[in-house]
UniProtKB/Swiss-Prot annotation:
GO terms for biological process: translation. It comes from Chlamydia pneumoniae (Chlamydophila pneumoniae). Binds the lower part of the 30S subunit head. Binds mRNA in the 70S ribosome, positioning it for translation. This is Small ribosomal subunit protein uS3. SMART domains: KH (SM00322). It comes from the Bacteria. Part of the 30S ribosomal subunit. Forms a tight complex with proteins S10 and S14. The keyword Cytoplasm does not apply. NCBIfam families: rpsC_bact. Pfam families: KH_2 (PF07650), Ribosomal_S3_C (PF00189). Belongs to the universal ribosomal protein uS3 family. GO terms for molecular function: mRNA binding; rRNA binding; structural constituent of ribosome.
Amino acid sequence: MGQKGCPIGFRTGVTKKWRSLWYGNKQEFGKFLIEDVRIRQFLRKKPSCQGAAGFVVRRMSGKIEVTIQTARPGLVIGKKGAEVDLLKEELRALTGKEVWLEIAEIKRPELNAKLVADNIARQIERRVSFRRAMKKAMQSVMDAGAVGVKIQVSGRLAGAEIARSEWYKNGRVPLHTLRADIDYATACAETTYGIIGIKVWINLGENSSSTTPNNPAAPSAAA
């Protein structure tokens, strides 16, 4: 039942890197975990991080380093670094610790599942046909060089009385193959009829070595 599991968690440590890089003892682990969740929830709500695909949290000797993976680094940095400085101050107040921010630019946003899912959600919220949004996104992903893509939407589609799910698939998306580099993400579109859920799977190809996780974004700036 490979389709029932999360492709990211299934491949973490094999072809995917951990998104929290720290060690905590029995007393610290729960505190650190909750702090990571709060940091990610806080950043997700910031307008400057709307184009962010993910956040990697590292801890070292009382300091926290957060890497923001985004397709729009200029929006996060702000004019003369004003926005990133504000984020650092707000995170310092939230955690009570010194926080470093690093901005990693995503060179090919069409191949990032989170950015694709968020884009479909925004279109559905603007009352674009969900089928048109899905097919357009799939075409962009395949044109960018993906091996395969699958997109599923669920909810009261087009205002239907009964909720249902629809999905489209193009190419190969093997969920059981560990060496297959599958990117997966979800998003929600808030409509007048209720919440529409979006799931995106993108097959980026197979890794020749399944023991070396790939790097989804390269650091471009630090603050």
